[in-house]
Regions:
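A compositional signature for long Ser/Thr(±Pro)-rich, low-complexity
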Residues: 1-173
Length: 173
């Protein structure tokens, strides 16, 4: 039985007395849509030093947590650190300068999330980190018409495309 929404789905398996919950946390850190300095109003702002409060609220009730993420950092976002705008992805502003890149923001967010989980005194569960997934689309990327729907088995090691960006993102986990 599936009860939920895009943000959270819940399946209960009566014969095993087991519940599986899928919690959607795009960036694993707190986000805001509030206006912030000169960042565009419609832009998602990531508070890199604050874990996702929805995930942290559920954490004490979770026995096994599987974390999978990273690809959302390629979306248009602003990065906040210490209450200041420190970078962004797919937008710029003369006052921002170069700012921190997507990869550094991802590393900070991973550290924030994993540290918060590891030090939560009420969480007694097991955490499994699924590393940043390699490129797996045929005929283009996810946003240029590529598809992964024809995949019928896991890729063999020699079939995986080696991409420096993917390898960097994995190393930051």
């Amino acid at each position: 039985m599936n009860k939920g929404s895009k943000k959270m789905q819940r399946w209960y398996f009566r014969s095993f007395d087991t519940t599986i919950i899928r919690v959607w946390s795009s960036w694993l850190v707190n986000t805001t849509s509030e206006p912030w300095e000169y960042a565009p109003a419609n832009l998602t702002k990531l508070k890199l030093e604050e874990p996702d409060p929805n995930l942290m609220e559920l954490l004490p009730r979770i026995d096994v947590l599987v974390i999978s993420g990273g690809h959302w950092f390629a979306k248009k976002t602003a990065y906040l650190l210490g209450g200041k705008l420190v970078g962004g992805q797919l937008w710029s502003h003369k006052n921002l300068g170069k700012g921190i890149p997507e990869t550094e923001a991802f590393g900070i967010a991973m550290e924030t999330s994993l540290s918060s989980i590891a030090t939560d005194p009420l969480y007694k569960g097991l955490t499994i980190l699924r590393t940043y997934s390699p490129d797996h689309y045929d005929g283009g990327t996810w946003n240029t018409g590529g598809s992964c729907t024809e995949k019928t088995r896991p890729s063999r090691p020699w079939e995986v495309a080696h991409n420096p960006h993917t390898e960097l993102m994995r190393s930051l986990q």
